[in-house]
């Protein structure tokens, strides 16, 4: 949303059919919009770890930023401070698995890009919120996989993305859906390179996260 005022106006309007439980302005102000025990309209058509329509089982936080369409910019320090504090309080009230701390783009990669590649997921992970790749071991080299590839290697990496939680068909065809899922993964975990290609760097991070998640 371009501003907190526009975000709040939209999220309290019944006709908009869009809402979240919380909203954080660029100055760090936190607004409570919907009680956490009630369903908000923030996830939309979505999928994560075998579940559809995540509005029923998730807590949504809107962080004010113009976004990619209107001048995307880094999130402010007051916003991030407030977000860390809010998330830590939410986690005290709700037993949320670290893998289930996700971006809108993770659960709806064909529709959404937020919060995007300027969002500091590593900071949240250092505070016990979600996961982040650290101490990455190098996986065996493979040639980059990209749009229109069709082979068993594609199917292998599709299955790994699905194991982490993403929703995609595991058919060995590197179609548009797979490319969008890879870009969503990169926006979250490899923000310096968002090209939809599974190269050595992206595959290393994915392998690391899968192994890390198994230990949680």
Give the positions of each predicted feature:
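Short, function-defining helix-loop hinge/capping sites that tune catalysis or transport
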Residues: 70, 112-114, 183, 207
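A generic structural signal for short coil/turn motifs at secondary-structure boundaries
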Residues: 69-73, 109-111, 169, 193
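Active-site-adjacent loop/helix surface patches within enzyme catalytic domains
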Residues: 1-99
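A charge-rich, low-complexity, intrinsically flexible signal that marks solvent-exposed coils, linkers
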Residues: 48, 114-117
